[in-house]
C-alpha cells in the first residue's frame, strides 16, 4: 500500500474473461486504475468495456496491442468519463496509474493479454510490475 492505494499484480490475467473477473472482484469495494495490454492473441476486447466503465477510474494501456484494446473499449469507456492513457513501459504505466488513483483506490495490473511483446513471460511481467511499484514506494518514501 502506497499513500492508501493498494497495488495488485494479476499478470496471469492473460485473457479478457480473467480480467473481467478481476475487475468485478476488486472493483466491488473501490475504484480501480487498471493496466491493460500486451500481446492480444486476436481476442475480442469489447467485453472489457462495460466492466471497465463501471469499476475503473482510469485505464493505462501498454504493449503491442494497446491500440486494439483502446479501439474496442473507447466508445463505452469514454462515454462514462473514464480516461485512457498510453504508456511505453511498465514503470511509466505504474507512474501514470499512481497519479490517477485516489485514496482508497487500487491499481490493478490485469492485462487481458499475453506478455510476450514486452516480457519473457507472465512471471517476468509480474516481476517488472512489482519492481515498478517498489520504485514508486521508494520515490514517495514508503517502505514496502
Feature annotation, model-predicted:
Residues 1-144:
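ATP-dependent carboxylate-amine ligase
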